Each structure stands twice: as C-alpha cells, then as structure tokens.
Amino acid sequence: MKKGGIVILDFGSQYNQLIARRVREMGVYAEVVPFHEDVDKILAREPKGIILSGGPASVYAEGAPSLDIKLFQNNIPILGLCYGMQLITHLHGGKVARADKQEFGKAELELDDKNHILYKNIPNKTTVWMSHGDHVTEMAPDFKIIAHTDSSIAAIENSDKNIYAFQYHPEVTHSQHGFDMLKNFIFGIAKAEKNWSMENYIESTVKQIKERVGNKQVILGLSGGVDSSVAAALINKAIGRQLTCIFVDTGLLRKDEAKQVMEVYAKNFDMNIKCINAEERFLTKLAGVTDPETKRKIIGKEFVEVFNEEAKKIEGAEFLAQGTIYPDVIESVSVKGPSVTIKSHHNVGGLPEDLKFELLEPLRELFKDEVRKVGRELGIPDYMVDRHPFPGPGLGIRILGEVTKEKADILREADAIFIEELRKADLYNKVSQAFVVLLPVKSVGVMGDERTYEYTAVLRSANTIDFMTATWSHLPYEFLEKVSNRILNEVKGINRLTYDISSKPPATIEWE
C-alpha cells in the first residue's frame, strides 16, 4: 500500500468497496484489508486513518469478528461504521444488544453536538441510511453521544483516543450528507493529504513496469473488454512492442467485436496483436452440452489451451499480463467469519500450472471507474472505455442450453440492435449492463400469412453501483416497443421477446 492513505478493515460489509471508492473520490488512497490483518502490518502502512466497516455479525455472538485492542492504542484516527461502532463499544466496555426496533432504510439523524468537526457544514437534522438489527444500549466509559435517531444512538466519540463511530452508513448515496461527513473525518480529523490521481498512477505504474520487465517480452490475452484493453494500453505505453496481445475469437463474441478491437488498436496504438479464429474449435467442444457450469469450464479450459499454444510461439516471453482489478482482489481474499471468499475470480490465482510466467497486473489497485479514467487518459475511445461488462464465456452463457453457430448468430444480431437503440436513445450510459438472452424455448407466431415456430429472447438491463446488488432498468415503454419491433422484424429466428424485471438478489444479472 502507498503510505499515508486510509486503511479500511473489512468485517463482511457489502459496502466495503464503496467506502474505499468514496475515499478515493476525495483524492486520497484507500485500501481494503481483512479485519484479522496483523496490527503491525496495518501500522507499517503508516495510515492517516482507519475505517472499520459494517458487517452482518453480532459483536456479542460467539466467534464474532473482532480486533486486536492494540490498534486503538496508537492514536491513529479510527472511524467505525455500523458493526464497527458496535465493536468499538463492545471492546471498550459498553453494551450492545438486539434492538426491539430494528432500523433498515432511511432514518432522520439529529445532532447532539452541532459544532463537532465531523458535522461541519451539516444541518442539525438530516437523512441517513441505516442497516442494523443490534444497537448500543450502554455507552462505553469516556465515550459521548454526538448524534441520535428516534430509536438509537447514531454517532459516538472518544476524542482523547481519537476514536469516532457512526451507526449509519455515510458511504451510501441515501445518506444525504454522508460524503461530507466522511470528508470531515478524512481531512478534518485524519488530516489526510490528496495523494491519489489517475495521472500519477499512470506515471508511477509505467515506471514500475519498465523497471520490472526490462528488455523481456510480455503477453496478454486481449478480450475487447475494458480491463484487458486498458491493461494493454498501459503496458504498451511502458514497453511498446515488447508486449504481444493474443485475441482469441471464440465464436462467442458480440457482433463485429474482433474487427472493432483490431481497428481500435491499429489506429490508436503501435502494438503487436495476434488474432486467432477458434470459433469451430469452441463450438465443437460445446456441442450437446447444456449445463451452464460445464459450458463455463469447457470455454475456460479451451481458451487456456488456445492461449497456451500461441504463447509458446513467442520467444523470450517471461511475463503474463492480466486485467485484474481491485474488486477481483478484494473478492478473492479469504476473510474468516462473515466474508469467506465470495468467488474465486478467473483473474486471481487462476494461472494454469504449465504456464511458467511471472504475473503482471498493472490495474490490480484500481476500481472499475478508475480503470475507465486511465483508459481515457491513454487515448482509448469512449465507446470502448464505456462498454458494459461482458462475461468471460461470452455468448456461451447467454444462450441457454446447447450452444450452436446458428443460435450465436441469432443472438449476436438481436444484441447488436438492443445496444444500438440504447446508444441512439442516450440510454446506454444510464444503465450498468444490458444484453439479450436466447432461451431454449420456441413458440408459435405469425409472420405475414405464415405460421412461425421460433425462439424466444429476453432483454436484460440492470442498474447497479457494485454489481453485488442490482435493480432492473425502468426503460421507457416506447423504447422497448421500438427494440421489440426491430428484433422481431430484422432477426430471423426470434418471434417472441420478453423483458426481465428481476432484481439481484434473488436473481443474478446474467442468466447462467
């Protein structure tokens, strides 16, 4: 970690990444680490402040996540959020219990200390976001209440020990002045300095890549997605044609994707790119397979084999570059208790054993919005930088059931129309992810005077901040009608279209 930033201890909160992003938006470096990180390792980072995240546990329960009390003995400013406030109270001799009236959602915060530095320029009453079933019932000695709601103690402090805490979540947008409250802690109490910008990141990363790689060769699997594209541009800036990108056309890509990627990089960068057409190979392996997990494994295994074959042809290649980003790293760290690994990400710890390369991950400290900023700084066109996420297995998991060339071609055309219309209506950048799913279901229709018996497709569009929870996009009816008319009239093979209005949870954004 860069020294002099903010350390966020993760107790299993769904908002831990959001806290870090909020701090970084202020121009201050923030890093998320597991709550059980060794205190000496935390102190070695020389943090200006420490934030304790929320979490789903109860501090009084057996085996609940806790902290080494030593952390509170160094006079480093500490801010506890939700579970963090309850833990601070519990460890300092106060009491926490199940609340008779639990608080989930918006609540009115009233300040007890209007002049407190945390509430500088904050009105006496404001709306905050609560999400807790436990509450503080008895204050710890030497702590005082600085804000409350109708049903709970909402903020506390022990200024002598430099410890502060909120029962609510200032990091979420529903907390009206939450960003300013965090800002007051970061700059007013922790005295952090602005030390984080994408311009500085590019400069320092280019220098590090040059020093580490020297005159050796680097290979990178270019997918056309944002992360691998930005990683390629950043490494190319550092070492030029010592980088070779391998683009594998699996036959499961979006319409004209291979052509677009090759054109963008030919026009904007002096870069070695090998485009491998492996469509027939992938579709042959997928023939007859309907189980989604099996499809994922086949596509992943085949991709590695194709990549491996091509990588061996590049003389002097000692580094394998990947577009791993910070959320991949956070989600792949095993945290005891509440945050057991959420998922083993394909970019983290997933190297095949026979690929004897050193790993180069120039984006592993960045969130997705920061990756996009770096991409723009490096000259990647907006339409590439702002592309919606596309899964590694591609259309293989957007075609439910068996994958065939016919189905892939049908889905490609339908998806291209949906995306084209979203762009025309200036809606593309207002939704987080949009795509079409092809179902293994046929239904009767009428085209002209003839009966048809063709596939059903689904439009899926979701809005989200962190992709861990999501709502369906409330697209205008007139827009949906236009998309429906175009797909049903222009795409041979689809005669029925539906719109997915499921939120995550309980559904996921992708169908497989």
Swiss-Prot record:
Keywords: ATP-binding, Glutamine amidotransferase, GMP biosynthesis, Ligase, Nucleotide-binding, Purine biosynthesis. The active site is at residues 82, 169, 171. It comes from the Bacteria. GO terms for biological process: GMP biosynthetic process. ATP binds at residues 223-229. One of its GO terms (molecular function) is GMP synthase activity. Gene3D superfamilies: 3.30.300.10, 3.40.50.880, HUPs. Pathway: Purine metabolism; GMP biosynthesis; GMP from XMP (L-Gln route): step 1/1. Residues 5-195 form the Glutamine amidotransferase type-1 domain. CDD domains: GATase1_GMP_Synthase (cd01742), GMP_synthase_C (cd01997). Catalyzes the synthesis of GMP from XMP. PANTHER family: GMP SYNTHASE [GLUTAMINE-HYDROLYZING], GMP SYNTHASE-RELATED. Homodimer. This is GMP synthase [glutamine-hydrolyzing]. The lineage of its organism: Bacteria, Fusobacteriati, Fusobacteriota, Fusobacteriia, Fusobacteriales. The gene is guaA.
